[in-house]
């Protein structure tokens, strides 16, 4: 490791870069109802800003991953940071919802660069137990982001408005850009990929022909659909239907983030990843059905919140184990498999997000919960049994 880049420096910088996803998606959630009034549009159109950012986060991973392998880590990362700053300025000064939605797509692409390249830098700089330790610490920093981001947004929404939230994101982008200028190149020229772009795309096809990999990626994708249906609908349900303030909503959002994180930690208590994944999928299906009935009947908040906490906990059981199962199935193409896994999951989130804004939000959300949970469970049916995990 270069002497100019200490472990503490790398931990903070890479941790914040990997947290781009939650900051880009979660921080402005409490402002969605206010943005509906500001742009004089529907909730579904405002949620398109979430959709396009998810699509950008998905597509950008497929772009920045190969770019960083061919041209090094530093230049693509600096490019992503400049793009993030520019797209955030476009969000702030958007005069109509179409401009805002377009800017959010660019912001998602820029954020994906930080997510993908930060993992690559850690792999370049460290090896063995040091790499495992660094990735665990980065994961801890990243795990705090979904809790902190909506609280910051909810606390400041009433005082600075939605443009103020994006001004904070702009300042974060400037700080990270300054930090990236200090980052030394971690991939020397002699280690960079020399393969043609056609070979890279052919490796995507090879991975997609792996039935076991596809099964677990689909399972994760539909589980992400449940997650982003919740993310897109919760501001309107909690603030619009139940009458919560932006700050009260952010506290509930943070509590629900704990459900996902604690489930991921609890999943290691299962005997193998397959059991954790199957238990989580069955739990998702049961809680999704109960939550749909609750939303349809218009039950009280605590019934809604209790079932939602259970739904998110069940979903969290699948995340870590499904990732391990998918990556284990495509070990020979780990880089490609990782990029595609992230891209497909964010794509599912982007597709699902606007669906909860069609018609009655309560009924639409319940329907999306059931369909995604059912498809997540059915996806496991196409996965062939694997001897490494099939033991009781």
Predicted regions and their residues:
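Cytoplasmic helix-loop-helix junction between adjacent transmembrane helices
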Residues: 103-144
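A late C-terminal transmembrane helix in Major Facilitator Superfamily
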Residues: 325-361, 368-369
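Paired small-residue
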Residues: 83-90, 98-106, 302-308
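Juxtamembrane intracellular "pre-TM" segments in multi-pass secondary transporters
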Residues: 2-3, 185-216
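Helix-loop-helix hairpin linking two adjacent transmembrane segments in secondary transporters
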Residues: 99, 129, 136-181
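C-terminal transmembrane helical hairpin of 12-TM major facilitator-type secondary transporters
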Residues: 277-321
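Conserved MFS/SLC helix-loop-helix module at the cytosolic interface between two early adjacent transmembrane helices
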Residues: 59-98
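Helix-breaking motifs and short loop linkers at transmembrane-helix boundaries and internal kinks
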Residues: 40, 72, 93-99, 110, ...
């Amino acid at each position: 490791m270069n002497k100019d880049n200490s472990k503490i420096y790398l931990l903070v910088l890479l941790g914040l870069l990997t947290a781009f996803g939650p900051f880009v998606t979660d921080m402005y959630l409490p402002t969605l109802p206010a943005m509906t009034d500001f742009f004089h549009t529907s909730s579904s159109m405002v949620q398109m800003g979430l959709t396009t950012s998810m699509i950008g986060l998905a597509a950008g991973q497929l772009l920045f991953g190969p770019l960083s392998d061919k041209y090094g880590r530093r230049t693509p990362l600096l490019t992503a940071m400049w793009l993030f700053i520019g797209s955030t300025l476009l969000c702030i000064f958007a005069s109509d919802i179409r401009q805002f939605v377009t800017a959010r797509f660019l912001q998602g692409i820029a954020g994906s660069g930080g997510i993908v390249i930060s993992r690559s830098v850690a792999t370049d700089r460290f090896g063995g137990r040091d790499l495992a330790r660094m990735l665990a610490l980065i994961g801890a920093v990243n795990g705090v982001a979904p809790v902190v981001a909506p609280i910051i947004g909810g606390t400041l929404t009433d005082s600075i408005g939605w443009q103020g939230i994006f001004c904070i994101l702009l300042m974060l982008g400037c700080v990270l850009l300054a930090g990236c200028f200090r980052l030394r190149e971690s991939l020397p020229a002699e280690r960079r990929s020399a393969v043609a772009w056609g070979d890279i795309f052919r490796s995507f096809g090879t991975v997609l022909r792996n039935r076991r990999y596809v099964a677990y990626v689909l399972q994760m994708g539909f589980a992400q659909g449940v997650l982003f249906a919740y993310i897109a609908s919760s501001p309107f349900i909690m603030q619009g239907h139940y009458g919560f303030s932006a700050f009260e909503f952010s506290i509930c959002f943070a509590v629900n983030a704990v459900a996902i994180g604690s489930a991921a930690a609890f999943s290691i208590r299962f005997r193998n990843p397959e059991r954790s994944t199957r238990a989580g999928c069955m739990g998702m299906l049961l809680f999704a059905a109960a939550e749909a009935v609750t939303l349809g009947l218009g039950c009280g908040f605590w019934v809604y919140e209790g079932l939602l906490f259970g739904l998110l906990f069940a979903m969290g059981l699948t995340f870590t184990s499904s990732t391990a199962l998918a990556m284990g199935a495509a070990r020979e193409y780990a880089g490609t498999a990782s990029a595609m896994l992230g891209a497909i999951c964010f794509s599912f989130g982007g597709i699902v997000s606007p669906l909860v804004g069609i018609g009655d939000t309560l009924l639409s959300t319940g329907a999306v919960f059931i369909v995604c949970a059912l498809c997540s469970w059915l996806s496991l049916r196409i996965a062939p049994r694997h001897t490494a995990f099939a033991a009781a």
